[in-house]
UniProtKB/Swiss-Prot annotation:
Domain (Peptidase S1): residue spans on this chain: 22-245
CDD domains (UniProt xref): Tryp_SPc
Keyword annotations of the record: Disulfide bond, Glycoprotein, Hydrolase, Protease, Serine protease, Signal, Zymogen
Family: Belongs to the peptidase S1 family. Granzyme subfamily.
Record propeptide residues: 20-21
Name by which UniProt lists this protein: Mast cell protease 2
InterPro entries listed in its UniProt record: Peptidase_S1_PA, Peptidase_S1_PA_chymotrypsin, Peptidase_S1A, Trypsin_dom, TRYPSIN_HIS, TRYPSIN_SER
Disulfide bond residue pairs: C51-C67, C144-C209, C175-C188
Length: 247
């Protein structure tokens, strides 16, 4: 498919292309996903957008590179993002580290680290999520869970409460219709026969497989039909480790 046609068909899951949601999923038990981060983003054009992300260290959040902006505030300890609780911790981002090879057109290398201005306080509602080992392989057929505050229907606003959905890992063949899909650095996720998917607003949220973050929500077709493309975290462990070590 020609790149222009691809971009007519696809949109980024993040708020730069309107915030997304979990379709066909269920509401999470409050604070059962303590690593989840809700990102409030002021773009370079002074628009407000949102993404999801997840805490991997007390002062670092992992998300998608297309969720970058002029400034970002991270909300931790939230379930309903519109109903303030004592569990909330709002922390500004000190520095954004989008992958140096991220391409906004092909959406390759869609991964970013956010260094927080202060360390999060670890509580029952705020915790960290482990990452996979370097270049570890997760086989197709595995059923994982995507988590985020995205839409629950294509024509609905984003969800106020945290949602999750079960999604199956597919062979690379399942995403052959995406011109720029690379199996080595991306995951093809979601049964095309089921209307269960991530969508706008879920960008940057994790794909959880046995309690480990294996993927980062990147993009999906405009009509929200599965499969979706996630950034494969294990491929980027050397880069992640370098940023964490040096900062």
């Amino acid at each position: 498919m020609h790149l222009l046609a691809l971009h007519l068909l696809l949109f980024l899951l993040g708020s730069r292309a309107k915030a997304g949601e979990i379709i066909g999923g269920t509401e999470c038990k409050p604070h059962s996903r303590p690593y989840m981060a809700y990102l409030e983003i002021a773009t370079s054009k002074n628009y407000l957008s949102t993404c999801s992300g997840f805490l991997i260290r007390r002062n670092f959040v992992l998300t998608a590179a297309h969720c970058s902006g002029r400034s970002i505030t991270v909300l931790l300890g939230a379930h309903n993002k519109t109903a303030k609780e004592d569990t909330w911790q709002k922390i500004e981002v000190e520095k954004q580290f989008p992958h140096p090879k991220y391409d906004d057109y092909s959406v390759l290398h869609d991964i970013m680290l956010l260094k927080l201005k202060e360390k999060a306080k670890l509580t029952l509602a705020v915790g960290t999520l482990p990452l996979p080992a370097k270049f570890s392989f997760i086989p197709p057929g595995r059923v994982c869970r995507a988590v985020g505050w995205g839409k629950t229907n294509v024509n609905e606003p984003t969800s106020d409460t945290l949602q999750e959905v079960k999604m199956r890992l597919l062979e690379a063949e399942g995403c052959k219709h995406f011109t720029n899909f690379y199996h080595s650095s991306q995951l093809c996720v979601g049964n095309p026969k089921k209307m269960q998917n991530v969508y706008k607003g879920d960008s940057g949220g994790p794909l959880l497989c046995a309690g480990i973050a294996q993927g980062i929500a990147s993009y999906v077709r405009r009509n929200a039909r599965p499969p979706a493309v996630f950034t494969r975290i294990s491929h980027y462990r050397p880069w992640i480790n370098k940023i964490l070590r040096e900062n």
